[in-house]
Every structure is written in structure tokens, then in C-alpha cells.
Design a protein with these regions (language model features):
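C-terminal interaction segment
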Residues: 1-28, 32-81
Length: 81
């Protein structure tokens, strides 16, 4: 199982299914999940310890202790508008 998972939310995704996936990921040993919301150009970070945070379009994502030294601007995850 990977340490980091990226989940991209589409307009048809159901919240309950996403929550179920998150539980499955963390049960399997995933440490960090980035749930990417293309419509709002934002990301929600979920951590295995239960912590989490919204990162908006002007924010930065880091690999934290999962990918030390890695960072990316949220805006770079999406095509230019």
C-alpha cells in the first residue's frame, strides 16, 4: 500500500463512497491522502492521525513526513484558466 494517495473528486462522486475509501486507505496503512476538488481548485489533506486541512487555490501542498522536501502549488495541479 502506498504512503500517499491522491483522490480526484468528480461531480458524480458520492460523499459516503469517498469517506468509505478514506477509511479503507487508512486501515491499509496509508499515511496521507490528498482529496482533490477540481471544481473549486482546492485540496483537502487527510492524515492517518485524524488531522486534516483545506488548502485553497493559492496554497501549497507539502509531502510532510511522507515525502520530505516535496512541495507543489495547488494551482499547478490544474490547467491554466
Amino acid at each position: 500500500m502506498p504512503d500517499l494517495v491522491f483522490e480526484v473528486i468528480s461531480p458524480n462522486d458520492e460523499t459516503q463512497k469517498t469517506e468509505t475509501k478514506l477509511q479503507e486507505y487508512f486501515t491499509a496503512g496509508v499515511r496521507l491522502v490528498w482529496v482533490i476538488y477540481p471544481e473549486s481548485r482546492s485540496v483537502y489533506i487527510y492524515r492517518a492521525d485524524g488531522g486534516g486541512a483545506w488548502v485553497g487555490p493559492d496554497g501549497m501542498l507539502t509531502g510532510e513526513d511522507v515525502l520530505p522536501g516535496f512541495s507543489v502549488a495547488v494551482k499547478d495541479l490544474f490547467p491554466s484558466s
